[in-house]
């Protein structure tokens, strides 16, 4: 079972990590006032990076609240997202949304991201072989 912490190893820390996700995302999930970009990372756990600029959310209090909610939602749903580097980009108007609505919205976005992942080729091939033999 994946631990539900948000330790240093589960964060995107360097500009190189962010650039890799921005340059070649394997998954994009647009949402209400935000965009989630994802890329396979080859690890057994997901990593999260947040981009919340002053232009999109003016007040520091609101930016900090959003970051806290995003991290918490990621922490609770990370078993769905194993092996992904994820960047959340905030857009204008995100700061005005209330906490319960944001939690619900993030839950839906994580599920959409998990569904949009490409299935591993090994699993697809082995399933095809089994069905042909039967």
From Swiss-Prot:
GO terms for MF: 3'-tRNA processing endoribonuclease activity; ribonuclease P activity; tRNA binding
Catalytic activity line of the entry: Endonucleolytic cleavage of RNA, removing 5'-extranucleotides from tRNA precursor
Record-linked Pfam families: Ribonuclease_P
One cellular-component annotation, GO: ribonuclease P complex
Entry keywords, A to Z: Endonuclease, Hydrolase, Nuclease, RNA-binding, tRNA processing
Gene3D superfamilies referenced in this protein's UniProt entry, alphabetically: 3.30.230.10
EC number: 3.1.26.5
InterPro entries, alphabetized: Ribosomal_Su5_D2-typ_SF, Ribsml_uS5_D2-typ_fold_subgr, RNase_P, RNase_P_CS
Enzyme class: hydrolase
Signal peptide residues on this chain, from the entry's feature table: none
GO BP annotation list: tRNA 5'-leader removal
Quaternary state and interactors: Consists of a catalytic RNA component (M1 or rnpB) and a protein subunit.
Similarity annotation: Belongs to the RnpA family.
HAMAP family recorded: RNase_P
Protein name: Ribonuclease P protein component
Protein source organism: Pseudomonas putida (strain ATCC 700007 / DSM 6899 / JCM 31910 / BCRC 17059 / LMG 24140 / F1)
Lineage: Bacteria, Pseudomonadati, Pseudomonadota, Gammaproteobacteria, Pseudomonadales
């Amino acid at each position: 079972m994946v631990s539900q912490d948000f330790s240093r190893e589960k964060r995107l820390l360097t500009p190189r990590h962010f650039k890799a996700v921005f340059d070649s995302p394997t998954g994009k999930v647009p949402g209400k006032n935000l965009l989630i970009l994802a890329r396979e990372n080859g690890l057994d756990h997901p990593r999260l990076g947040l981009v919340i600029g002053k232009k999109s959310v003016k007040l520091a209090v609101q930016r900090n609240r959003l970051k806290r909610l995003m991290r918490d939602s990621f922490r609770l749903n990370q078993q769905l997202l194993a092996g992904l580097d994820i960047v959340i980009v905030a857009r204008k108007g995100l700061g005005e949304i209330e906490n319960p609505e944001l939690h619900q919205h993030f839950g839906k976005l994580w599920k959409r991201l998990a569904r949009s992942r490409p299935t591993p080729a090994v699993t697809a091939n082995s399933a095809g072989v089994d069905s042909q033999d039967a």
